[in-house]
């Protein structure tokens, strides 16, 4: 019977081989994509559990199907742990992704066609903060705010002035490529000054917020959204937080039946496990290592005149580097580094002049290497290897040397043993 196929290597060797290749790639690549991380075996085990069989439309105690007593316990644990981590009164753990979480938050806060202010994509914002190719930009009237052209930092006086001109119903704070502390109290003041709601997307910094290493938006935002992977080091998924009971009801309705059907209870179980890991004191040590590694790497680039670190540094898990004095564009840099087994992404920089398919910059994040065990010494070495590869793009002998040094690092810090 099909149900007896426990060994998928024998049943489906094509998929098994592809997964094995990905395991090999992750083991022998240095992962610097800021939105990626490495989950624990416990998180993977929960996500791969028998819960994948269970349908459970609705919420704990209010399901549309029977046989949900157990998943009610699991989802309730996830909710309570999320509330404890972030000091929120209400939490919805059902969003399948951060984009789904943002979509539901918009539905709870505004109406189609309403004016919204969100961070410009090239300044560090996210597609769901009003990009024209996103549902957000197509459903709502988004007006983008940017950063100061000189400092490349948020200019709250300029944002306030723009808000008074635009009169938005909602202001969205948060970013996917902004490397400094965000003052959410300032955004609250601006929102109040123009009678707007405030939503914060803390997807990238949630783990730092949880560890007390970045100010929390929860006391200031009407709704806070996040992903559960990235710096939270959980499974891929979303989370919505609020302290407002009426908004909590609107959020729940927006998720189900609004934009989703049955929740992924196996993923919610994995979220619950990850949340328990976040509540362990060891997580704060991990989060501090993320910061230390990012700042050490950024400093290496700052000391090389051919590279420019955007906004001159970092206060979180990521930073951007303008590479156009060394290679043609960010895409070239990304592809070259892929060849030496260093994985990162091309990224637009503030007031970008190149297309988003090329970009002037690269984005470097340290959440995954910190999870793997890399410290400051290893992080500095990685930064030096990136520079070495980019400055010697046509020198195969040097690139081979970089590959060898990358392999030494990855062999010294294995991901998982006996996984496949």
UniProtKB/Swiss-Prot annotation:
PANTHER family: SERINE HYDROXYMETHYLTRANSFERASE, SERINE HYDROXYMETHYLTRANSFERASE 1. Keywords: Amino-acid biosynthesis, Cytoplasm, One-carbon metabolism, Pyridoxal phosphate, Transferase. This is Serine hydroxymethyltransferase. HAMAP family: SHMT (MF_00051). Homodimer. Its main location: cytoplasm. The gene is glyA. The keyword Transferase applies. InterPro entries: PyrdxlP-dep_Trfase, PyrdxlP-dep_Trfase_major, PyrdxlP-dep_Trfase_small, Ser_HO-MeTrfase, Ser_HO-MeTrfase-like, Ser_HO-MeTrfase_PLP_BS, SHMT-like_dom. (6S)-5,6,7,8-tetrahydrofolate binds at residues 121, 125-127, 355-357. One of its GO terms (cellular component) is cytosol. Pathway: One-carbon metabolism; tetrahydrofolate interconversion; Amino-acid biosynthesis; glycine biosynthesis; glycine from L-serine: step 1/1. One of its GO terms (molecular function) is glycine hydroxymethyltransferase activity. Its cofactor is pyridoxal 5'-phosphate. The record marks 229 as: Plays an important role in substrate specificity. Its EC number is 2.1.2.1. Belongs to the SHMT family. It comes from the Bacteria. Catalyzes the reversible interconversion of serine and glycine with tetrahydrofolate (THF) serving as the one-carbon carrier. This reaction serves as the major source of one-carbon groups required for the biosynthesis of purines, thymidylate, methionine, and other important biomolecules. Also exhibits THF-independent aldolase activity toward beta-hydroxyamino acids, producing glycine and aldehydes, via a retro-aldol mechanism. It is an enzyme of class 2 (transferase). It catalyses: (6R)-5,10-methylene-5,6,7,8-tetrahydrofolate + glycine + H2O = (6S)-5,6,7,8-tetrahydrofolate + L-serine. NCBIfam families: PRK00011.1. GO terms for biological process: glycine biosynthetic process from serine; tetrahydrofolate interconversion. The modification N6-(pyridoxal phosphate)lysine is found at residue 230. It is found in: Cytoplasm.
């Amino acid at each position: 019977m099909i149900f007896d196929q426990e060994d998928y290597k024998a049943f489906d060797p094509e998929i098994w081989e592809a997964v094995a290749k990905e395991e090999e790639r992750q083991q022998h690549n240095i992962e610097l994509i800021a939105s990626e991380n490495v989950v624990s075996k416990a998180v993977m085990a929960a996500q791969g559990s028998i819960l994948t069989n269970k349908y459970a439309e609705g919420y704990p105690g209010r399901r549309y199907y029977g046989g949900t007593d157990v998943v009610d316990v699991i989802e309730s644990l996830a909710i309570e742990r999320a509330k404890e981590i972030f000091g929120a009164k209400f939490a919805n753990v059902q969003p399948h992704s951060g984009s789904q979480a943002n979509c539901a938050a918009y539905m709870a806060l505004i109406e189609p066609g309403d004016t919204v202010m969100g961070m410009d994509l090239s300044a560090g914002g996210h597609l769901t903060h009003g990009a024209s190719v996103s549902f957000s930009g197509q459903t709502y009237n988004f007006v983008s705010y940017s950063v100061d052209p000189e400092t490349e930092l948020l200019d709250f006086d300029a944002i306030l002035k723009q808000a008074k001109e635009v009169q938005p119903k909602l202001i969205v704070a948060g970013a996917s490529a902004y490397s400094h502390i965000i003052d959410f109290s300032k955004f609250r003041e601006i929102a109040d000054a123009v009678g707007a709601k405030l939503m914060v997307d803390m997807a990238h910094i949630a783990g730092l917020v949880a560890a007390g290493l970045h100010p929390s938006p929860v006391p200031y935002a009407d709704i806070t959204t996040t992903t559960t992977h990235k710096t939270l080091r959980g499974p891929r998924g979303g989370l919505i937080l609020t302290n407002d009971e009426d908004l909590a009801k609107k959020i729940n309705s927006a998720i189900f039946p609004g934009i989703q059907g049955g929740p992924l209870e196996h993923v919610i179980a994995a979220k619950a496990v990850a949340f328990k890991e976040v509540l362990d004191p060891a997580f704060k040590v991990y989060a501090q290592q993320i910061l230390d590694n990012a700042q050490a790497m950024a400093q290496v680039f700052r000391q090389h005149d051919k590279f420019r670190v955007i906004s001159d540094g970092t206060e979180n898990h990521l930073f951007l580097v303008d590479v156009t004095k060394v290679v043609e564009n960010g895409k070239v840099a990304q592809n070259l580094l892929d060849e030496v087994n260093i994985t990162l992404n091309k990224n637009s920089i503030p007031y970008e002049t190149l297309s988003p398919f090329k970009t002037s910059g690269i984005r470097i994040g340290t959440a995954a290497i910190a999870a793997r065990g890399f410290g400051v010494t290893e992080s500095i070495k990685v930064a030096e290897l990136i520079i070495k590869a980019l400055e010697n793009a046509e020198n195969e002998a040097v690139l081979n040397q970089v590959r060898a040094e990358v392999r030494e690092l990855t062999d010294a810090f294995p991901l998982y043993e006996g996984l496949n």
